A protein has these predicted regions:
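Conserved AMP-binding A3 loop
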Residues: 45-49, 179-206
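Short beta-strand->loop structural element characteristic of the AMP-binding/adenylate-forming
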Residues: 74-76, 83, 87, 91-122, ...
Length: 223
């Protein structure tokens, strides 16, 4: 068997975590457009400052709801704007994201929640809620529904959490800390959790950007 490899274009991170992508951009380039979201017939641009603020208030809501450092929080949904906010909010709060396919069966969801030790789950639709409610393990203390305007609900819940507490959570994460626990499809047995650290994602993102700088770094570039 032949093996091929190429040297990394970017060095492995020695400090920081994934939250720095948003927090640092909000600090140094607050008006820079970070993403666009569908709005009516068009698109709404979201700046670094706006994105950071929405993630922060959502993270405060998670903390107020009992999410502790290192807690696993599951998200069962398609790719959508709320996913991005919740993904980063869980990291800002010091937690670990557990993605679940939106097509997963109740049995699969139960296994993933139990095996991962998740303490909360966010689902996309009422149908998802109906699927997971009967099988929630006792460790799961919170179930949120995206279509119930979960971001606004969490923002309101976190009003009493101060910035210092949030920043302590966010800044305490090291590159080697677990960021996401992704489960395999389970075609040959029970789904297995794959551990991905902040360092894994940072290295991947850094090398992708460096390898496609004409796409990512040119003015106005987007994907």
């Amino acid at each position: 068997m032949n093996q091929y490899s190429v040297p990394a274009l970017e060095p492995v991170a020695s400090n920081g975590n994934l939250t720095n992508y948003i927090a640092d951009r909000a600090r140094f380039e607050p008006t820079r457009v970070m993403l666009s979201r569908p709005l009516g017939e068009g698109w709404q641009k979201v700046t670094a400052h706006e994105l950071d603020q929405e993630v922060r208030v959502t993270a405060k809501g998670l903390i107020a709801s009992g999410i502790k450092q290192g807690d696993r929080v599951a998200i069962m949904a398609r790719t959508r704007y709320e996913w991005t906010i919740l993904d980063f909010a869980i990291w800002y709060a010091g937690g670990v994201v557990v993605p679940i396919y939106e097509t997963s069966s109740a049995e699969q969801v139960e296994w993933i929640l139990t095996d991962s030790g998740s303490v909360a789950i966010i689902v996309e639709t009422p149908t998802h809620k109906e699927t997971v409610t009967p099988i929630l393990p006792s460790a799961v203390k919170n179930l949120w529904l995206m279509t119930d305007n979960v971001l606004a609900i969490l923002a309101k819940a976190g009003a009493s959490i101060n910035d210092d507490e949030l920043d302590q959570r966010r800044n305490s994460l090291a590159p080697s800390d677990l960021a996401t626990l992704i489960y395999t499809s389970g075609t040959t047995g029970k789904p297995k959790g794959v551990q991905l650290t902040h360092e894994n994602f940072i290295a991947e993102c850094g090398n992708v950007v460096a390898g496609a700088s004409d796409l990512f770094l040119k003015p106005g570039g987007s994907t």
